[in-house]
């Protein structure tokens, strides 16, 4: 009789273990699918007015002109424009996942000073996200400013792209002329 009870419990345990381990779902759920970013819009405003610059994937030259001695507020927006009838704004997801993203402008030039804007979004640690920045056009000249959207950076401060770690979601070279 005791042997029958042990056998019964062993079979019950085996059956329960088998059902828990099996799954009909052969396609695992993607937890964080990477977005396609193929359009970047940069809105620049100052007391003298505003300009909007749009880059689309495949554009070979992205240039903007600024005036010396002027402070600019710069806002960056990312889009998936693969379907022209259904353009998807990526910024809401970047903001929602602020701890996992950072927008960085790599600037090795002395013609511009770039800082976080006070109205910029922040991550849970209070670090600026970089979607809104202030640019001061210090003097006449030209430079290439590199814009990066970084996914899962190791840090959110630095002077060059390599300081941040993580993966680059999108990079854009901006040819800036200050007159």
Question: Where do the PLM segments sit?
Answer:
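Bacterial N-terminal signal peptides that target proteins for export
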Residues: 1-10
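First exposed extracellular module after export/assembly in secreted or surface-exposed proteins
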Residues: 29-179
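Bacterial Sec-dependent N-terminal signal peptides
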Residues: 3, 15-42
